[in-house]
């Protein structure tokens, strides 16, 4: 099944995940791009260690580059759309709950504006 990757956009027009990616050095952007392509190619079939479920319909795509642990948070919209909400550089431990909560709020906003589950 083909998946389509989209980036969450706030009402004000900012795209937190794209902004995070653009802020990275070129070599990291390239690897993050390949990681997102993998996610688009595999969708629900992607498994650990590449992805993990964080709860409340939020997942993370893990991207390890040298000593850097990038995380891209996303959710599924219907059967074919993956919405990437935000990114972060994880230093240690779990993804902070505040970051997961923000991704969950982005999901609620997306569903409200786009029209619920498809």
Regions found by a protein language model. Give the residues of each.
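Basic, Lys/Arg-enriched alpha-helical interface segments
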Residues: 1-69, 78-82, 88-118
């Amino acid at each position: 099944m083909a998946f389509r990757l989209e980036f969450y956009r706030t009402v004000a027009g900012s795209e937190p995940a794209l902004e995070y990616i653009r802020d990275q050095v070129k070599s990291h952007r390239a690897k993050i791009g390949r990681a997102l392509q993998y996610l688009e190619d595999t969708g629900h079939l992607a498994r650990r260690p590449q992805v993990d479920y964080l709860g409340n319909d939020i997942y993370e795509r893990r991207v390890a580059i040298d000593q850097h642990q990038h995380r891209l948070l996303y959710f599924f919209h219907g059967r074919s759309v993956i919405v990437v909400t935000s990114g972060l550089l994880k230093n240690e431990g779990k993804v902070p709950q505040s970051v997961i909560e923000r991704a969950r709020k982005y999901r609620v906003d997306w569903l409200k504006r786009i029209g619920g589950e498809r």
